[in-house]
Amino acid sequence: MHHLLPLLVAVPLLGAALLAATGRHLPRTVADGAACAVSAGSAALALLLLAHSSPPLTEWAGGWEPVAGHSVGILLTGDGPGLGMAALVCVLTLAALAYSRRSLDEPPHGHAGAFPALVLVFQAGMCGFAIAGDLFNAFVWFELMSVVAYALTGHRVEEARAVQGALAFAVVNSLGAYALLMGIALLYARTGELALARIGDALDAHGPPDALVLAGFVLVLTGLLVKAAAVPFQFWLPDAHAVAPTPVCMLLSGVMVELGVFGVWRVYDTVFSGPGGLPAADAERVLTVLGAATAVTGAVMCWHQRHIKRLLAYSTIAHTGLFLIALGTLTPEGDGGVALYVVGHAGVKAALFACAGILLDRYGSVDEHVLHGRARPLRGVAVMVVAGALGLAGLPPFGTALGKSVAEEAAGGPFTVLYVLTSAVTAAAVLRVAARVFLGLGPTPREAGGEGAEDAYETTGSGEEPESGRRLGRVPDTMTAVPALLLAGALAAGAVPGFGTAVARAVSGATTAGLVHTSVHWTPLGVGLGLLSSLLAVALAAVAVARPGRLAVPGRALPLRRLQSGHIGDYVAWLLVGTTVLGVLALPAVLSG
């Protein structure tokens, strides 16, 4: 079975190559159908391998197996978390391709295979990163998915905003990749190894961590946290989501950002969790401090957005912070909770972006103010947006609710309050949009670009062009079926008995500590906190709609909004600041050693 692991990468790459070569001669329906078939086949393969992933599968590509414990071959590891992420990537890619069939206009120059080919390469890069067993090839897959993501973000190259957003994305993430590569070089200089497990063993044999190990940890983590859009590396994400096509946003927020979090978990657990790596107390401090800052920043910025796609992007940032806090507990419960949380969040967030895309193609805007009351006819879409918002809030029985429940119980203390408030605020922002856009509730907002100093830093969603090339008179069934199925999947992740426990055990079985039997189930406290965050979200949204001036105080968030300047130089400066902060937070590991 392990010999099938390379196919998770080879199949989508081959499909992309064939579409790129023959796309000019294929009808769009055939090209899109072929891409969907490749993604569906890859998803089936990932699920098949996942069912046989205990014990973990290993494959040395090309037969380059270790000799005397050393190898220069490419190691692929098929354990529960890696194959689970690969399956999630394939399923979400299939959803994005199916959605794009009617949401995007005709391909440029008559090349029907161009967009689906890029999406398949993106899928291959993400799957390769998920199953990479050595650090250098993880970097290679990291770069492949990054480069393709830049191209997909700037797909509408005729628009200056798309190019600018893609450029900011590319520059910041490329610098993060350089940091990752330098960290790999330092670790290789110390250990002479590239396989993740071998690096960890070599560091443990060397003794307590020193400045070189600290530098390697900080640089590797910087690259991964840039991809995860953690504070203060997050500035590229809202700019990219504002201009990227909706199917691309579904993948960026649904799974690519989560792969950055997955990389943080994988690298720390396999490489740095031993006596030669970073002590547990220092790792906990790094992850929880950054996680808390990310959650608060994302929630505050999410609340003050009127551009719906930017609002959803900041929501992703906020929930990334919650993921990092749970990882920072360094417990099997925290890891299992995050894994289930990621699955539920992927379905909910991709569905919400799909609904935002429907608004853009139907009304030519994603501005909450401009769309006030205009989407009353879209009752089905309204129901899905409300359901997605409640999923973000953690309403049982969504998978997000069960995962969040386990994670917040593992974190405990003040972090429980942060989980409730962050999920409530991000959900309330989406509910506010639903009430105004689909029901026309509340006073009519003032014209976009109004007065006030804060408006200079406010990004509206007006003036957008429909991605379908023209405003849709009727929303195609595929564009509504995709978010409906995604929400159903997110609901099933929490409602299907035993699914959460299976996810948690798959994660714990892949850790260096070995299998820890954890049971993920609903508890009275978890259900109560989920209901509390949902009720709080509804209350906040109701006040925001009925009394806009009471909670809408943009001046309080003005310092944060000014930081989102759109200037690449500012974003690079913050990347350097973030790297320094990581070093300061981890420094006690060296001083105590």
Say what each PLM segment does.
Residues A244-P245, R376-V381, V433-L531, A546-V581:
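Cytoplasmic/organellar membrane-interface segments at the starts of transmembrane helices
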Residues M1-L7, A17-A117, E193, A197-D201, ...:
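Transmembrane helix-loop-helix hairpins at membrane boundaries of multipass inner-membrane proteins
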Residues L13-L18, S39-L50, C90-A95, A295-V296, ...:
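Hydrophobic core of alpha-helical transmembrane segments in multi-pass integral membrane proteins
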Residues V584-G593:
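Juxtamembrane boundary at the C-terminal end of a transmembrane helix
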